[in-house]
Amino acid sequence: MKIKHIVSCFFVSLIGLSACSIEELPYNQLTEDELDGSYESLLSATRGNYAVFKQTAFHQGWHYAGELASDNVSLSGVSSDALMYIYNYQRITDNYHMSNMWGWAYRSIINSNKILEKAQEGESKEMDQLIGENYFLRGWLEFVLVNVFGRPYNQSPETNLGIPLN
């Protein structure tokens, strides 16, 4: 009986230790090695950049920043959500709506930069199309971030430069 218990403990620990070397890669993301400069890998990464716009965390923050801080929306009642700070023109550094928007936008900007580093201009019309799309995506996201987080130009333009570009 004792030997059965020892053998069963041995097999359980053997199975447990063998699971330590399992490395699961994300099924919907590319690794740095997979982004090899081929058209297919760059197309897949560009599609991933477009997927950012479906993220609630991105478009919700963008919508809140533009609409709640304007006269287009009227909130009534009491809420403990951080959107009330936006509605009342109170900027707080830990507003998760704004930090999520910032994070998703910069994730796509960084991905566009990586794609633009790997892509070879003039290789084909399709590759040039991808390069143009990534320049547009990066520029548009930087434009959105400056509109939401940047200061007006007349408020110390020497020190308030907008957003970090890299």
Residue ranges and their predicted role:
Residues 23-31, 36, 69, 88-90, ...:
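Generic, ordered loop/turn and secondary-structure boundary motif
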Residues 1-28:
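Bacterial Sec-dependent N-terminal signal peptides
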Residues 20-63:
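Membrane-proximal, proline-rich intrinsically disordered regions
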Residues 54-60, 73-76, 141-152:
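Secretory-pathway/luminal and periplasmic proteins that interact with or process carbohydrate-rich
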Residues 148-166:
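Short coil/linker segments at helix-helix boundaries
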Residues 82-149:
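Conserved, well-structured interaction surfaces
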Residues 40, 48, 55-57, 63, ...:
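A structural signal for short, hydrophobic/glycine-enriched beta-strand patches
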